[in-house]
Amino acid sequence: MSEMTPREIVSELDKHIIGQDNAKRSVAIALRNRWRRMQLNEELRHEVTPKNILMIGPTGVGKTEIARRLAKLANAPFIKVEATKFTEVGYVGKEVDSIIRDLTDAAVKMVRVQAIEKNRYRAEELAEERILDVLIPPAKNNWGQTEQQQEPSAARQAFRKKLREGQLDDKEIEIDLAAAPMGVEIMAPPGMEEMTSQLQSMFQNLGGQKQKARKLKIKDAMKLLIEEEAAKLVNPEELKQDAIDAVEQHGIVFIDEIDKICKRGESSGPDVSREGVQRDLLPLVEGCTVSTKHGMVKTDHILFIASGAFQIAKPSDLIPELQGRLPIRVELQALTTSDFERILTEPNASITVQYKALMATEGVNIEFTDSGIKRIAEAAWQVNESTENIGARRLHTVLERLMEEISYDASDLSGQTIIIDADYVSKHLDALVADEDLSRFIL
């Protein structure tokens, strides 16, 4: 679990997301409150429930990007889902309970990786011994049983030294490794994913733990043996329990496109993929117990962050019970020309840096001038205003169009430097930006 302070979290998000300070602060406080809650005594800790967040803002301003970056910072079970993928219980489609099942699966993977990393040193020792057993088989007595030697032989010690120094890396050995589990692909209708995974695990267990002799270079065998030995040192039951605890205490669910499940106007008949989904989300957000293949999971202390553009619907179109369970509202602002300029230059791996690196692989040096950056930002903003406003995503479209000619001829331009200034941008984009019909279809 992350122990970063809110200021540190915001600072980390600033490296990738421009503006939207209110949203960053709310998310940072929510994440820090998870840590604060764990410092309380058990009785009070049980009473403190997370304050769920609803992020409202037009498309392309950073809602989903905040979720992506938060997943890396949280160091806790995290899952991002699209609200539009779910239907009401009893109809064809995914049930909302599958969110918690997927979150638990993610937690099991995360906890397994942590447990393997914790046992890595011991696993390396065991893997080393197995390789030495192949290189210098231990002495056997008259009954064919391996004798336990008090002291390793001089030859074994010499080989151990060579192995650690990497002198034997390219030597081939034949070694017994655990055979890969039997792979069974099962096609199931939507909504039956849980049954499919249970059947697959059942078929895999039928195969048992078979050993298979393989001929490998020592450096490759070492990697596989370390994984195998580390997996043996992990207790599966303990791992499942740790994963369930991690989900219940630190789990975070990000629900995107929640505005798409708002009811629009009066309609007769069941609304299975809109209001029905909202009703099914209520118990999850409020707190209930969900059955997963790893055990029962309580959702009382899972943090839910929902986001939506709300261009057609309004937050008040959500059913009142769900509105009440998303108490913190954060509005994200539409992006301006100056925001676009910052997006093109400030993030760690901004789009311009990516294009420079891509063209450098062909030996072409690309230079973006300040005037060029400003003109690209103005063109993107202008197209957003005259057609549909898709936020920062418009920059990808504009830049791809601008770089199309260079990308096509890159192999012939090796060794050259191309300067992209305001004149270059105007020459390639002005006609498209000015013609609304063209920009509607091309940009």
Swiss-Prot record:
Protein name per Swiss-Prot or TrEMBL: ATP-dependent protease ATPase subunit HslU
GO MF annotations, alphabetized: ATP binding; ATP hydrolysis activity; peptidase activity; proteasome-activating activity
Induction description: By heat shock.
Domain of life: Bacteria
Native species: Escherichia coli O139:H28 (strain E24377A / ETEC)
Biological processes annotated in GO: protein unfolding; proteolysis involved in protein catabolic process
Cited function: ATPase subunit of a proteasome-like degradation complex; this subunit has chaperone activity. The binding of ATP and its subsequent hydrolysis by HslU are essential for unfolding of protein substrates subsequently hydrolyzed by HslV. HslU recognizes the N-terminal part of its protein substrates and unfolds these before they are guided to HslV for hydrolysis.
HAMAP family in the record: HslU
Keywords: ATP-binding, Chaperone, Cytoplasm, Nucleotide-binding, Stress response
Amino-acid positions noted as binding ATP in the UniProt annotation, renumbered to this chain: 18, 60-65, 256, 321, 393
Subcellular location, record wording: Cytoplasm
Predominant place of localization: cytoplasm
Organism lineage: Bacteria, Pseudomonadati, Pseudomonadota, Gammaproteobacteria, Enterobacterales
Membership in a protein family: Belongs to the ClpX chaperone family. HslU subfamily.
GO cellular component term of the entry, any: HslUV protease complex
Entries under Pfam families matching the protein: AAA (PF00004), AAA_2 (PF07724)
Assembly information from the UniProt record: A double ring-shaped homohexamer of HslV is capped on each side by a ring-shaped HslU homohexamer. The assembly of the HslU/HslV complex is dependent on binding of ATP.
Chain's gene name: hslU
